[in-house]
Amino acid sequence: MFKSFNGLELKSSENEGRYLIATRDIQIGEDLLKCKSYFAVTSETLKTTSCFNCIKQLPSVIKLSLKCNQCNEIWYCNEQCKNENINKHQHYECKFYKKLKSPKLKVYPNFDIETFTEIRMIVGLLSRYYQDILLNNKFIEQQLNNNNNNNNDNEQLTNTLDDVFDLVENQVTEESNPAAKERIDSIVEFISELFNLVLLGSTTTKSIINNDDKIEMIRKINEKSRSIIHKTRCNQFGIWTKNDKCIGVAVSPSSSYFNHSCIPNCTDVRDGSNMTFKSLYPIKKGDQLTISYIELDQPIQDRKDELKYGYYFDCICPRCNGDSNSIDSMDNWISKFYCSQKKCTGLYYSKPMIPILNTLTSNHEIQLSCSNCNNINIVTPSFFNK
C-alpha cells in the first residue's frame, strides 16, 4: 500500500507500531501525504442531510431526496454521487443496513446514536470481508477507476481491505476499560445476530450456498468482528464541518501511519473522505511525523485520559512526560497554532509551501489557515521561532 513519497519513510517498532519519519528537512506547509479513505459512513443523526458518497453535508437544512430505495439508510447529494456509489453500496452493505432496525434483533439499551454510526462502519467493513474474501466476489470498479483518473486521484494513496486488517489494534479488556469492553461485547453480539438474520434468511444465494456453508461464514465473520472494532476505534477519523459538527467517520489505513503527539509537527486537512497531511513548521531530517488525535488545549491529565479511554494507549510524548519548565515551554509553543475561533479545535497551517524562513524578511506576511474552519491568521517569520 505505501509507495514512495518524497521525504517520507515508513518504519515500525514493537512499542510504536508503524510510523513515518522525515528523510530530509521539510519546510512549512508541505503536502506530505494525500489519501482517500477505504470506507466512510455518515453519522446516524445526519445521514439524511449528508451524502454517503462524498461525505459532505448540504449547506441547507433541507433533507436529501436521492437515496438507496432498497435499504432506505443512505442518501446522496446529487445524481453523480449516487451513480458513483449506489452499485457498490448495494453489492456490499445494503442488505445488512436494511435490517439494522429489524424488530427481530435484540434491543440494546446502551446503544446510542454514536454506537449506531460505529455499527454502520463495522458492518460495512465486514460486508466487504464477506463478499471479497469469503465469497471471492469483489465489486468491479471499472467506472469508478475512470472517474478517479479524471480527478487526479493517482496522487492519492489508496487502501485495501488487507490494509484495514493490518492496522494495529489495542485490546480492550475488563481491566483496562470495563465500560468500553461491555459496549464492544454488545456490538459484537448485535452484529452476529444481524449477519445470522440476513444470511440465513436470504433466498437469493440458496442455490449456490447451503446453510452449513453460511453458518461457517458467519462463524468466520464473528471471529473478525471484535478485532475490526478494536482496529477502527484506534484508527478511524471523524469528518467534520466548518462548524465543528461530526458528519461521519472514515477508515483510512494510510492515515494511521501518523502517530499521535500533543505537540505535533503536522496536521490533517479533511475534505469529505479525502485527507491531506501538511507540515505545521520546519521538520528536521530523522524526526518522526506526528499529528494530534485529540483537542490539544486541555490539561495533561485530561489529554492522557482521552487517549487512554478513546484510543487505548498511554501518551508518552514529551509534552505529557517532560519536566514542568519544558512542558510550560511546549504549551506556549504549540498554543500559537490553536485556532482563535471559539469552540474550533483546528490548527493553523500554511496552504502553500513556505521556503526556508531565514530567506524571508522579518516583516514578511505569512497567511495561515485553520485546518477545520479555514479561519485566517496573518503572521511573520518570528511566529515559528521556538
UniProtKB/Swiss-Prot annotation:
Residues 136-171 form a coiled coil. Keywords: Coiled coil, Metal-binding, Methyltransferase, S-adenosyl-L-methionine, Transferase, Zinc, Zinc-finger. PROSITE patterns: SET (PS50280), ZF_MYND_1 (PS01360). GO terms for cellular component: nucleus. This is SET and MYND domain-containing protein DDB_G0273589. Its EC number is 2.1.1.-. It comes from Dictyostelium discoideum. GO terms for molecular function: methyltransferase activity; zinc ion binding. InterPro entries: H3K4_H4K5_MeTrfase, SET_dom, SET_dom_sf, Znf_MYND. Belongs to the class V-like SAM-binding methyltransferase superfamily. One of its GO terms (biological process) is methylation.
